[in-house]
């Protein structure tokens, strides 16, 4: 009998994906900031879809530091505000619908979402490659919000 591997275990990352948060001035710029090139967006969308098919699970994504151009888009102090970025992001999907946890830790950064957050996450990542962003998802009660930037 052949064991069927979860969809997410077959996922392979491609493209450039950046994630960061600001270490100062966070009252006006709270949470995590996500940007990716077109290949990175497609890769993240495939991961989200794979986790959805599996119903639960997790994968770790390699993170690139944001470029100067990426940092200028949110315009926190003209792109010069201090920031920190993880080298890895663990994305986990759990069956409990409303779960959202995204603590500030960076070793690795860990985003855990319930099924209700799958579609908003998918829409946000899709929007990056279309030049849409400057909005966030997530709750401040159990984790930092996630901002999408092009």
Write out the residue ranges for each language-model feature.
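Positively charged, low-complexity terminal tracts
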Residues: 1-150
